């Protein structure tokens, strides 16, 4: 089995039915998945934003799906060393939460892929030496 690090944009695509979701689910179906504790906040926030923009979406159903998806993803705890590593990246355009995800993936290295649908984060991950993926995009 391969090990893939998922950022929040990838986790959300596993929860919601978005254009890339089917391909992403197929690509990751038998793989080991990992992220960091940051997704415990980012994913529910993204779901709540989506429901606010599209009232046809059912918040309770999506939150339940998110909980099920997150149970299948190993979560790396955020600690001082990880946060300091994220803060030390030289790339000035790298946003704080993106830097935390990249630092977490590096901490787990080697990972077979860093899965993100955020191009700015993907660029930062590549600069840090990670192989990025966005299945279906």
Predicted regions and their residues:
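Short, well-structured N-terminal submotif of metal-dependent ribonuclease cores
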Residues: 1-39, 51-63, 128-130, 137
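Alpha-helix capping/helix-boundary segments
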Residues: 10-11, 39-40, 82, 101, ...
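Short beta-strand scaffold positions
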Residues: 6, 35, 77, 96-99, ...
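Acidic, PIN/NYN-like endoribonuclease modules and their adjacent C-terminal/linker elements
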Residues: 1-3, 103-137
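Residues that scaffold the ATP/ADP-binding catalytic core of kinase and kinase-like folds
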Residues: 14-15, 46, 124-125
């Amino acid at each position: 089995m391969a090990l893939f690090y998922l950022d929040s944009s990838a986790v959300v695509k596993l929860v919601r039915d978005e254009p890339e979701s089917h391909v992403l689910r197929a690509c990751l179906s038998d793989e080991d998945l990992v992220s960091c504790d940051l997704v415990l906040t980012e994913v529910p926030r993204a779901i709540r934003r989506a429901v606010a923009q599209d009232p046809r979406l059912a918040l309770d159903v999506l939150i339940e799906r998110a909980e099920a998806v997150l149970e299948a993803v190993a979560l790396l705890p955020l600690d001082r060393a990880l946060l300091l590593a994220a803060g030390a990246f030289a790339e000035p355009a790298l946003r704080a939460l993106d830097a935390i995800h990249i630092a977490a993936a590096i901490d787990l290295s080697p990972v077979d892929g860093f899965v993100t649908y955020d191009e700015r984060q993907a660029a930062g991950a590549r600069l840090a030496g990670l192989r990025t993926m966005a299945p279906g995009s």
